[in-house]
């Protein structure tokens, strides 16, 4: 399942649970996260850190000496079913300003509808563009200057997502990239287009 620190995955069509890495879409979660323009962000991923370390043990050195028990990475993104929203999620500057948000907190900090999410399934297909660990495979050239501050968690290709949620990055060809701060104080999420 590993290729130079990568763990490729697809999605299971099975009942999710709170201990799984989940990707989906929920706009009705508790403790709303708000963009600078007042728009409520959508919860698009839930990553329990202990589960991440089980699936991708290469992260253990990054989390060494960190308190991560019962913590999760929450990924929020600008989403609008009725209107164009791609510009809000493709610029790193917009992500830094809060049009997307990564929060590391208690596993129960946000109550959300778990049935709107799909658990990941680690696989051995090395051609998949959705994976945990390793280095990001950008669709467009991206400056790595900002990477020193972050740990790359993984990337998700829209077309790998189940049909019900495959437009959370606006187009299925788009890829979302998840990073966390090295001190676990938050992170960065943005999308690239082809």
Outline where the language-model segments fall.
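Preference for intrinsically disordered or flexible, low-complexity segments
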Residues: 1-194
